[in-house]
């Protein structure tokens, strides 16, 4: 009995590895967020007496004392305490994570928030700045269009709001699929009845014939794909000009 080899798909291993790496990154971000929150709580829990002791210790070391009068220092401490009291509930409602050297506050988004505003806030890299909420009932402003309805041109730049449609794949009324080529007809090699039939071909001969046929089929698919891409040449030209202007 021959031994049976179990082949493990490489894609499953890569998927499991990527999933483990993602879990590790999320766990690290969660732990770091807890540490940052504890540090903020410790800073918010400091009393004015701690600040006064710090001022006394600085004066004892011989450094220049603060030029403020006692009533000014008391006023400043009172303002700091009021700011901490007002900012306490706001800080407790923040959930800042850092991913690839950029931070975003996820507490400002709900479960139904689309991914685009979250990515936009992450790219801004300013967790303290909250994303402006757009009312779902407010209609979007209409896009300015010219006579053709494809683009708007001003004196400085060319703003494109709509790409031109692709050219038709074939003549009007012809329902053909431009991406799928026509099937290649099999080669029938028949022999007259009076001639003796050829012996059965060997496996290597069959493989060679099939390889030659599949090469022609693959070439037909490449040509069909190239013809289909040419239908979008105008759109590609506009996108290329937009990319080169950046």
Swiss-Prot record:
Gene Ontology molecular function: protein-containing complex binding
Organism, as annotated: Homo sapiens
Cellular component GO terms held in the UniProt record: Myb complex; nucleoplasm; transcription repressor complex
Name of this protein: Protein lin-37 homolog
Keywords for the protein's UniProt record, in alphabetical order: Acetylation, Isopeptide bond, Phosphoprotein, Ubl conjugation
Biased composition (Basic and acidic residues): 37-55
GO biological process terms, semicolon-separated: G0 to G1 transition; gene expression; negative regulation of transcription by RNA polymerase II
Modified residues (Phosphothreonine): 167
Pro residues biased stretches: 163-172
N-acetylmethionine PTM positions: 1
